[in-house]
């Protein structure tokens, strides 16, 4: 039970206990060791209908389930003489204090303090008054919100609200990108980084380093951070663009066998990254800022890769030894199926070019239950679907 010395706390808030349902919610919290703070947090928790006696949970409910202005929970706190206790606990837990406290300024304090821990540069002077000395508690609180499947969308909405009020994008745009890499408080960080990445790629600056990260390393890192759910496809597209730009000065190998060997070892990646670039590009809501990069990727693929590779391939295929360079598609049945005793499924797909098969092969290799092999064969000419299917089936002539 509650010790006699804490009875004045109960008496001060006796109005709260006038309702049996409210009273029961308080006792359902099963507070083990009563003291003044636990009692006050318990009362606040009961008003918010929280399931645990936790001030962090009270603040979470107040911020995510209510409005920042005319908040219904704060009105309830005031009704039961708990509002001053709420703000005192905000100071105690989060270091937030104000002559006229408000949820708006509390929220800004939380986000600015969190940002200050991860941005390596000085924050704008106008933000300094919002930096709290209780950064550890604030980081733990916001981490729990942003990493929760239940509350991450609420976090994003609160983050966007603060970002708009503080004009965060403009503030970050004036900082070095190196100083922003570790921060994911606001989506604006990714917007600044993406803008910088586009400029580097369009300039073909593939050696750019940001805070120790190469362009693909930065893309991978940011895609795994909080806003990766929204920005992941953009970073994957930029990473594919990097792979294309890196091969801008392409030179084909000499001879069909050398061309094939190099394609199997490395050049297939050009086709693969080109496909992935457009796969992610086509999923973007807005592509306007990416048009110069798309044009560069298209130019490299068409005018520097294909324009160099295809003439070399066409010359090589006309050599006498061309059709002995690798196994032929028309020999597929005799080589793989005629004498096998196991049931075999053959999937024939026009879309499954070698680079697609290579990606599937890589995924199958990661499956411990699967044994995968990848080999190549030379298709028939002319290369069209019906003739290709016939070449894979038992036949005497084509």
Where do the protein language model's features map onto the residues?
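Ligand-binding pocket scaffold of soluble enzyme catalytic domains
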Residues: 350
